[in-house]
């Protein structure tokens, strides 16, 4: 995509430093050597003729439900758990249609037509934390509630033909993925204790996500890690960090994790789970922090206290305090 040799050199250098070993896409990549007329085996991204937004949304509507079903099925909900679902929450910033994924979930699980549905859209990578906050409010106000949350993103649906280095570098980290979770009042897994948002309005232009004629247009400034580290250093987390055993930090990129670790003066292994998810899956926007929490849940000891953290446009950091039951 980049034609300037200097920019290509910078891109190759950044690839070598990304600490991403694998990413997934719902599109099949071209493999092997030689000249191609398309960036993918599906010939969706044909050279010089990238699809418009309408075509991308058509493909989202065709493809997203399958990924949603796989994520929900991994929960292996029994009949009692299914019948106890009263609310469905969906986060997604990479595609939209109506009736949407919330309806698809109800149909797939055969849920009651009276299930309450909420879509949290276009908030970016921190949307899962916001959805967990909403789920906690629901369960606290309705103790018998069961909230099924799905976080689904097809980031590779918005690949762009561009010579803008910052935009091309953003493609380097993003990938596709989905996560599903069940939030109830039962004492198991992680208990959600409290939430807080940290915003730095003077940096609102450093991450943007806008709908254009040829897909959704991402800007991820190289200034984000430094500004994020500075903002976190000035929060109460600095004083509380010794009380936190588990750090579930959204792996927005290696430089983001490095900035968080430095800004909060965390031990070298504090972000091991986040770095593993980044290496194995890349940045899947809102779904990513749920992958980190899943890994922590498998190893956490009862009573351990944690802090989950995701970042996005604003510049915003959404945080969640939790403990293992």
List each language-model region with its residue ranges:
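Acidic-glycine-rich active-site phosphate/pyrophosphate-binding loop
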Residues: 96-111, 149-160, 204-207, 257-271
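Phosphate/pyrophosphate-binding loops at sites that engage ATP/ADP/AMP, CoA/4′-phosphopantetheine
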Residues: 71-85, 232-246, 264, 296-300
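Glycine/charged-rich beta-loop-alpha catalytic/anionic-binding loops adjacent to active sites
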Residues: 51, 83-87, 107-121, 162-166, ...
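Short coil/turn connectors at secondary-structure junctions
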Residues: 83-86, 113-116, 141-147, 168-169, ...
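Condensing-enzyme catalytic core mediating Claisen C-C bond formation in acyl metabolism
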Residues: 1-59, 146, 155, 159-230, ...
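Hydrophobic alpha-helical hairpins/lids featuring a short glycine-rich hinge
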Residues: 48-83, 87-89, 93-96
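Claisen-condensing/thiolase-fold acyl-transfer catalytic domains that form or cleave C-C bonds
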Residues: 93-94, 112-114, 119-140, 229, ...
């Amino acid at each position: 995509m980049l034609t300037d040799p200097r920019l290509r050199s910078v891109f190759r250098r950044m690839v070598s430093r990304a600490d991403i070993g694998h990413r997934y896409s719902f599109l099949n990549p071209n493999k092997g050597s030689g000249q191609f007329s398309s960036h993918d085996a599906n010939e969706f991204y044909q050279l010089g003729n990238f699809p418009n937004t309408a075509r991308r949304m058509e493909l989202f509507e065709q493809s997203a439900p399958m990924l949603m079903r796989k994520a929900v099925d991994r929960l292996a909900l029994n009949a009692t758990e299914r019948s106890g679902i009263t609310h469905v929450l969906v986060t997604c910033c990479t595609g939209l249609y109506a009736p949407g994924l919330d309806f698809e979930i109800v149909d797939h699980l055969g849920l009651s037509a009276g299930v309450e549905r909420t879509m949290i859209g276009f908030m970016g990578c921190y949307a899962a934390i916001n959805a967990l906050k909403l789920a906690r409010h629901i369960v606290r106000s309705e103790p018998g509630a069961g909230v099924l949350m799905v976080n689904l993103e097809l980031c590779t649906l918005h690949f762009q033909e561009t010579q803008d280095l910052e935009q091309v570098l953003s493609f380097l980290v993003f990938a596709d993925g989905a996560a599903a979770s069940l939030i109830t009042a039962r004492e198991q897994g992680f208990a959600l204790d409290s939430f807080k948002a940290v915003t730095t309005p003077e940096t609102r232009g450093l991450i943007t996500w806008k709908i254009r004629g040829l897909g959704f247009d991402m800007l991820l400034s190289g200034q984000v890690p430094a500004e994020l580290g500075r903002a976190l250093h000035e929060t109460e987390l600095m004083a509380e960090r010794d009380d936190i055993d588990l750090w579930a930090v959204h792996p927005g990129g290696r430089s983001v994790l490095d900035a968080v670790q430095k800004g909060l003066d965390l031990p070298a292994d504090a972000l091991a789970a986040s770095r593993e998810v980044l290496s194995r899956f890349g940045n899947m926007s809102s779904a990513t922090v749920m992958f980190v929490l899943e890994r922590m849940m498998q190893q956490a000891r009862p009573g351990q206290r944690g802090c989950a953290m995701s970042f996005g446009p604003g510049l915003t950091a959404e945080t969640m305090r939790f403990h293992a039951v």
